[in-house]
Swiss-Prot record:
Gene3D superfamilies per UniProt: P-loop containing nucleotide triphosphate hydrolases (3.40.50.300)
Protein name according to UniProt: Thymidylate kinase
Enzyme class: transferase
UniProt KW Nucleotide-binding keyword: yes
Sequence similarity: Belongs to the thymidylate kinase family.
GO-annotated biological processes: dTDP biosynthetic process; dTTP biosynthetic process; dUDP biosynthetic process
Biological function: Phosphorylation of dTMP to form dTDP in both de novo and salvage pathways of dTTP synthesis.
Source organism of the structure: Caulobacter vibrioides (strain ATCC 19089 / CIP 103742 / CB 15) (Caulobacter crescentus)
Residues given in the record as ATP binding sites: 11-18
Amino acid sequence: MTQGFFISFEGGEGAGKSTQIRRLADRLKAAGHDVIVTREPGGSPGAEAIRELLVNGAADRWSPVTESLLMYAARRDHIERVIRPGLARGAVVLCDRFADSTRAYQGAGGDAPASLIAALEEHVLGGTVPVLTLILDLPAEVGLQRAEARGGAARFESKGLAFHERLRAGYLEIARREPDRCVVIDADAELDAVTAAISDVVVQRLGL
């Protein structure tokens, strides 16, 4: 059986990842592909339980190190129960956030040691990494305004503009270091333009 494709979507709060994932999923399904849409933290029952601990409560509820450990506990369950089985059956797995979110949120944003995050990646991911990562980029203040207007994961939104500016810089640095995997998409553009840009990249990179 043909191995599937693992595509992750990354970006700060209010970047529009969920909308763009849904649009890409609809296009791929219409073309006859088996598509799994999932998210992190979460995606499996165990990981969703951990998600509740992570996204609710005060901004300082967890330290960056503790957050990283919780994220990776959820991620491992998600990989074992959803991502790997999906890829094994040949599906296109579209994931709203993956390991780069830990690098950006807990690393660049929260100062968790890079050595800790690297060790977690090595031992937990076990080679399960996206073949393509789409980083939806926009100014931090614009993203926060969008997120506030829609409601949502208030714990991370409440961390303040400086945190989210570090977060954005962290994502752009990931893209700079890993251009073969990562593509930056201008998420401050019109909705349809963002969709078209994503579709173009997926066609060019993966032929989907």
